[in-house]
A protein has these predicted regions:
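A local structural micro-motif
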Residues: 16, 53, 108, 159-162
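General N-terminal targeting signals
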Residues: 89-90, 158-159, 165
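Short alpha-helix boundary/capping and kink motifs at helix termini
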Residues: 20-28, 33-34, 40-41, 63-66, ...
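Short active-site loop/helix that positions an aromatic residue
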Residues: 145-160
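Amphipathic, charge-rich alpha-helical segments that serve as recognition/docking helices
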Residues: 11, 149, 161, 166-168
Length: 168
């Protein structure tokens, strides 16, 4: 599959987000918070939270970048985090089974909330190097969970992510 086809399949495309347009008319506090981050991360935040509520504003205002660039995270380390395992449990049963088998896990199936559960099989067809960085806060993949699941399905040893620390 070609890269442009992949862009169309994605749940969103932060690369085409115009930061200034999206921020237009937003609360000054939100604009100030988002503007602290590199543009690529700003786009990811705005894709995930285009209309932030007060809880979003408080949460993201607490973020501190551990690195000015995305970093390569060891996938095995990410699998040691309970909340990342819970994210796996919210994927379709066949995806959970495939990940459990590949990684020697025993993640139980949970309720699937995903409006597009077929996307994981589509995403795994692409090389991890073509994916945007996920957003990891205190070791938990918060944004880009589909990219994380696809990396697990491919057996990727690393996932590229923004490494963020938060006190909340």
């Amino acid at each position: 599959m070609k890269f442009i086809e992949w862009l169309i399949l994605k749940e969103g495309d932060a690369s085409i987000i115009n930061v200034q347009q999206v921020l237009q008319g937003k609360q000054p506090e939100w604009i100030q918070i988002v503007s602290r981050f590199p543009e690529m991360l700003q786009k990811e935040i705005l894709e995930e939270r285009p209309n932030p509520n007060q809880e979003d504003i408080q949460w993201i205002s607490s973020w501190q970048l551990a690195s000015k660039q995305p970093v390569a995270m060891n996938t095995t380390t990410l699998l040691q985090n309970k909340e990342n395992l819970e994210a796996i449990s919210r994927t379709p049963h066949d995806i959970i089974q495939e990940i459990n088998k590949k990684w020697g896990l025993n993640v139980p199936a949970g309720k699937v909330y995903d409006p597009n559960p077929d996307r994981y099989q589509q995403y795994k067809q692409f090389q991890g190097s073509t994916a945007k960085p996920s957003v990891m806060v205190n070791g938990v993949i918060e944004f880009g969970v589909g990219r994380f699941i696809a990396a697990l399905l491919r057996g990727d040893k690393q996932l590229i992510a923004w490494d963020i620390r938060s006190k909340k």
